[in-house]
């Protein structure tokens, strides 16, 4: 970037002739007290000396003719053409200023010499110290415009003090934190005495200025133009006045050593903004700016969250802060101007999406710095370890300058990173800390000494980048062992696991929660309450497993906590054995839950009101179901004697008992018929309908709820073949499940599963239950397409979606079916095959029956038969 340079050594040496555009002033010994960056291959730091030797303007440098041309001092470039030489200097060495002039805007005073400008200031502006120089390039000429700044920090912008005089007044609250302003650049020349200049460059320009791609037309240089400086060997230069009790953090993006990729900066965003050095922006130039809004905590908090509020947010702020929307808009615009915030609409939207995910929004850079809490170390310097995501090249340097009461100290951090942003393990970075020097010694470059503090680890948290870290085998082993002991770990157990595994509390609790969820939803738990001797596999968060991970552990399920067979484990999924004992004791005392009892249970079990109330409700339903089953068992016991004579001993021996297990988890065809009929009526039954289904089918309410959820999912994905059969059928004509039974596979009344030798395979004895129609034909997908084809004779694309939904076929299947009909019509053959639909109905019904039930046939329970026989009589 273009800048100025003052040096006692000429930058450009002319061989023999003078350039008329370059004014040579050899009798000057001093130049302006400004230091600007120069190209250097060494890492540079900040230092100064009160003994200032102001030098000749860089635009008035001596040039030495070499073999009839011009030679560049900073490289081997030589040319006899002055224009080419000037172009080379501007393009390759933008820090070198040629052909400069000085203008006092207040007095319209123009001069080529800085000392003449200083004499003008002493004569016409006595006692004035708040000058500001603005560099402007016009017509291949650099002009420094001097203005008088009205807004101050109760003093100058840059104040030079001795090390013992580092005390100063507090920074004005109207200033802006450096952490939100363009980076302050402070550099020095190789071997010369220096002064400090503050260059306002946006943060976004830092990567680009490395390649010299952007050259701004204007650059502000803030300086203290006092020409007299006290000479001392024990002096230092302090930027902006550092608060006496503050360890301020400023940023120094310096040139790096060869081979290093880039220099990045890190400034904590959590430091008190009032204690950080400020950069002033004159807001009095905004006509309608209301300074009273600067002290409004609501607006400040809103701006700190996001600098671009929406119109709705501005309306809310206007109502809360009692200011007009226009004033609030102008205030936010001024704050963004002060802080150097200028985002494109796309960047604003992206930042709005990312403002809650833990990342700091900036224009895309090489590194995203995530602010973390800065803790003060034993040496008084703030810790400068911060979490950052490496998205560029490896081998970067994180540089930070921490200002204390005595000296500003730099502490570079060398990050040794593999350069892959999604890697699991970020290597540790060692932090050599510079030891502050309290004695009054000449302040040279603050270079880290050989002494180093205890090495700290900068471990990147992958969750901050939206990456879920894979747990190691050792971590998973510890978690599994703890899970087998207790699925709901106490705080002490979590703390122990945190120490052993190194995981955070949130990660451990989430792993336990996910594991409990996976175990509850595993297929082996469907009959857990019925098969006491079965083992249950614990599904351990499969996303944490790697290919080399050992197999998951198994454990015998504990059945003592679930004494009621009608309840699935899901109803007690979050309750411990102690909680269940308390609830059980309360239910035995009284099944009616009063408010006093509810409050007592809440305090004792730590459960919510809704959980306790739901448990009591399910308990009452379970009790009612048990009583109904007892009545059914009694009726079955009474009717068994009446039917004993109808069953031969051989057949009875071959018939399995109704209480036998083996397929007890399967739903009977009658139960499936009830559920399917209810699903066709409504996919989202009300609680009363769930209770009614549970009472009619004899299934647990949770099983019914689970079945409806699975069926809704299958319906959404188009996997229900029976839905349209039930939808188009007249449910009143379906007595039991006669329409779903296979033809010729029924069993005579009262007989076992065996078949007498003399009886044909297809014959059966018809009873009262089987008097309904043996087969009901429903329209299949092709039947719906056939009706549409007979009506329209072609496929209309507008009706394609409706046909797909009604026929339950895919888009390509529907199109192929109509294409086949068109082909048959052109060939003059039969459009539709005979008996096509009847075969499809029968096949689909048989496939559905085979998928949903393994039993060969189904007969109604005995108490239902008895009731039907009595009604017939």
UniProtKB/Swiss-Prot annotation:
Keyword set includes Iron: no
GO annotation terms (biological process): negative regulation of transcription by RNA polymerase II; regulation of transcription by RNA polymerase II
Zinc fingers typed C2H2-type, residue spans: 70-93, 102-125
Region listing for Required for nuclear localization, in residue ranges: 734-768
Region described as Disordered: spans on this chain: 24-63, 200-236, 626-667, 732-769, 829-873
Comp. bias (Acidic residues): 831-857
PROSITE patterns registered for this protein in UniProt: HOMEOBOX_2 (PS50071), ZINC_FINGER_C2H2_2 (PS50157)
Biased composition (Low complexity): 223-236
A GO term from the CC aspect: nucleus
Region feature Required for repressor activity, mapped onto this chain: 831-873
Region (Required for interaction with NFYA): 272-564
Cross-link (Glycyl lysine isopeptide (Lys-Gly) (interchain with G-Cter in SUMO2)): 159, 441, 454, 485, 629
Subunit structure: Forms homodimers. Heterodimer (via HD1 domain) with ZHX2 (via HD1 domain). Also forms a heterodimer with ZHX3 which is a prerequisite for repressor activity. Interacts with ATF7IP and NFYA. Interacts (via homeobox domains) with DNMT3B (via PWWP domain).
PANTHER family, per database record: ZINC FINGERS AND HOMEOBOXES PROTEIN 1, ZINC-FINGERS AND HOMEOBOXES RELATED
Name by which UniProt lists this protein: Zinc fingers and homeoboxes protein 1
Species of origin: Pan troglodytes (Chimpanzee)
């Amino acid at each position: 970037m273009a800048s100025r340079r003052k040096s006692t050594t000429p930058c450009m040496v002319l061989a023999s002739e003078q350039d008329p555009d370059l004014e040579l002033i050899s009798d000057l010994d001093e130049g302006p007290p400004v230091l600007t960056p120069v190209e250097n291959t060494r890492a540079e730091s900040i230092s100064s000396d009160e003994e200032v030797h102001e030098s000749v303007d860089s635009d008035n440098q001596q040039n030495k003719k070499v073999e009839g041309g011009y030679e560049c001092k900073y490289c081997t470039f030589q040319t006899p053409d002055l224009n080419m030489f000037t172009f080379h200097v501007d393009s390759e060495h933008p820090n070198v200023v040629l052909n400069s002039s000085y203008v006092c805007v207040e007095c319209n005073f123009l001069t080529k010499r800085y000392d003449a400008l200083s004499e003008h200031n002493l004569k016409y502006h006595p006692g004035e110290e708040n000058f500001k120089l603005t560099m402007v390039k016009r017509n291949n000429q650099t002009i420094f415009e001097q203005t008088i700044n009205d807004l101050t920090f109760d003093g100058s912008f840059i104040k030079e003090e001795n090390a013992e005089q580092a005390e100063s007044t507090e920074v004005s609250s109207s200033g802006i934190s450096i952490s939100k302003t363009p980076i302050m650049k402070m550099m020095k020349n190789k071997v010369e005495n220096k002064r400090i200049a503050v260059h306002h460059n946006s943060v976004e320009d830092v990567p680009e200025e490395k390649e010299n791609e952007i050259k701004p037309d204007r650059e502000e240089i803030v300086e203290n133009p006092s020409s007299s400086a006290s000479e001392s060997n024990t002096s230092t230069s302090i930027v902006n006045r550092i608060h006496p009790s503050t360890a301020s953090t400023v940023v120094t993006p310096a040139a790096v050593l060869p081979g290093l990729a880039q220099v990045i900066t890190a400034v904590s965003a959590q430091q008190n903004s009032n204690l950080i050095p400020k950069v002033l922006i004159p807001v009095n130039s905004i006509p309608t700016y209301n300074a009273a809004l600067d002290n409004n905590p609501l607006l400040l908090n809103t701006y700190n969250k996001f600098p671009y509020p929406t119109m709705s947010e501005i309306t809310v702020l206007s109502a809360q802060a009692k200011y007009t929307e226009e004033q609030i808009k102008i205030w936010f615009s001024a704050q963004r101007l002060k802080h150097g915030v200028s985002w494109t609409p796309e960047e604003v939207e992206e930042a709005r999406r990312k403002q809650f995910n833990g990342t700091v929004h900036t224009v895309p850079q090489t590194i995203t710095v995530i602010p973390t809490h800065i803790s003060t170390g034993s040496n008084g310097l703030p810790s400068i370890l911060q979490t950052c995501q490496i998205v560029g090249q490896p081998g970067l340097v994180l540089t930070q300058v921490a200002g204390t009461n005595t000296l500003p100290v730099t502490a570079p951090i060398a990050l040794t990173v593999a350069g892959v942003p999604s890697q699991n393990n970020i290597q540790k970075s060692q932090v050599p800390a510079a030891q502050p020097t309290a004695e009054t010694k000449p302040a040279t470059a603050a270079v880290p000494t050989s002494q180093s503090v205890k090495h700290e680890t900068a471990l990147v948290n992958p969750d901050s980048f939206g990456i879920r870290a894979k747990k190691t085998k050792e971590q998973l082993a510890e978690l599994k062992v703890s899970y087998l002991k207790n699925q709901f770990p106490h705080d002490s157990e979590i703390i122990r696991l945190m120490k052993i595994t190194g995981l955070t509390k949130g990660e451990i609790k989430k792993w336990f929660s996910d594991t409990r969820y996976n175990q509850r939803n595993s297929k082996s738990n469907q009959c857990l309450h019925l098969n006491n001797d079965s083992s249950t596999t614990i599904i351990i968060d499969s996303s944490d497993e790697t290919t080399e991970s050992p197999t998951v552990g198994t454990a015998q399920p504990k059945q003592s906590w679930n004494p009621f067979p009608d309840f699935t484990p899901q109803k007690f999924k979050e309750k411990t054995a102690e909680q269940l004992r308390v609830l059980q004791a309360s239910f035995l005392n009284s099944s009616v839950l009063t408010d006093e009892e509810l409050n007592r249970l809440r305090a004792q079990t730590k459960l919510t009101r809704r959980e306790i109330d739901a448990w009591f409700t399910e308990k009452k339903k379970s009790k009612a179901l048990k009583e109904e089953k007892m009545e059914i068992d009694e009726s079955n016991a009474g009717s068994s004697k009446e039917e004993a004579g109808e069953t031969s001993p051989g057949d009875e021996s071959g018939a399995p008992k109704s209480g036998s297990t083996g397929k007890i988890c399967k739903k009977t065809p009658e139960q499936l018929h009830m559920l399917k009929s209810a699903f066709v009526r409504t996919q989202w039954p009300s609680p009363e309908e769930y209770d009614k289904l549970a009472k009619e089918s004899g299934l647990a309410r949770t099983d019914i709820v689970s079945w409806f959820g699975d069926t809704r999912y299958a319906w959404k994905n188009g996997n229900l073949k029976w839905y349209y059969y039930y939808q188009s059928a007249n449910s009143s004509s379906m007595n039991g499940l006669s329409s779903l039974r296979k033809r010729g596979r029924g069993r005579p009344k009262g007989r076992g599963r065996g078949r007498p030798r003399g009886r044909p395979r297809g014959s059966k004895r018809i009873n009262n239950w089987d008097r309904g129609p043996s087969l009901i034909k429903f329209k299949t997908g092709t039947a719906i397409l056939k009706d549409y084809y007979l009506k329209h004779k072609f496929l209309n694309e507008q009706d394609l979606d409706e046909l797909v939904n009604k026929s339950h076929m895919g888009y390509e299947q529907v199109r192929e079916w109509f294409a086949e009909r068109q082909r048959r019509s052109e060939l003059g053959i039969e459009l539709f095959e005979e008996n096509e639909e009847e075969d499809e109905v029968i096949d689909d019904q048989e496939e559905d029956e085979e998928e949903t039930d393994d039993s060969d046939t189904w007969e109604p329970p005995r108490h239902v038969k008895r009731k039907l026989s009595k009604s017939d009589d």
